[in-house]
From Swiss-Prot:
Organism: Oceanobacillus iheyensis (strain DSM 14371 / CIP 107618 / JCM 11309 / KCTC 3954 / HTE831)
Keyword Mitochondrion assigned: no
Name used for this protein in its record: Uncharacterized N-acetyltransferase OB1458
Domain N-acetyltransferase: 9-151
Keyword annotations from UniProtKB, A to Z: Acyltransferase, Transferase
Amino acid sequence: MENVKVENLLINYKTLEKFKRFREYGNQELTMMEDLENNIIENDSKSPFYGIYFGNNLIARMSLYEVSKQYDYYFEPSQDYLTLWKLEVLPDYQNKGYGEVLVNFAKSFELPIKTNPRINSHGFWEKMGFIKAHYEMERDLGENPLIWLPEGVKEKDMKS
């Protein structure tokens, strides 16, 4: 996976067109088009969307949001963390390491990461070093989040 570059995707109509390919292949719950449409403002605004291009084609993408320390109910010590949403690789490019490249890019920020895996993807996330967060009904609201803990960080004990 040398020379594979993760790019911050611009929030514009050109990116919206590229996202349409994912809607053709993916599940409705993974589509980021609505997210992008809601974020189309200026080309230079900070985009939460990241992707990998193969030639001129966007072949893999994810959303990565930074959550402020004041809303941290997952990690000890409390700190800013990342929420990784909607990681998706087009079918022709799956099982070639592109998803791993995106996750490793997120890990490079050296912040804890939370994700809510979809579509039988737990095996992938476990391979990437994510663990199941202890379920807390009020916090998790029916989701089953997985978390990644960088060195020196542990899961918050919600009982205390």
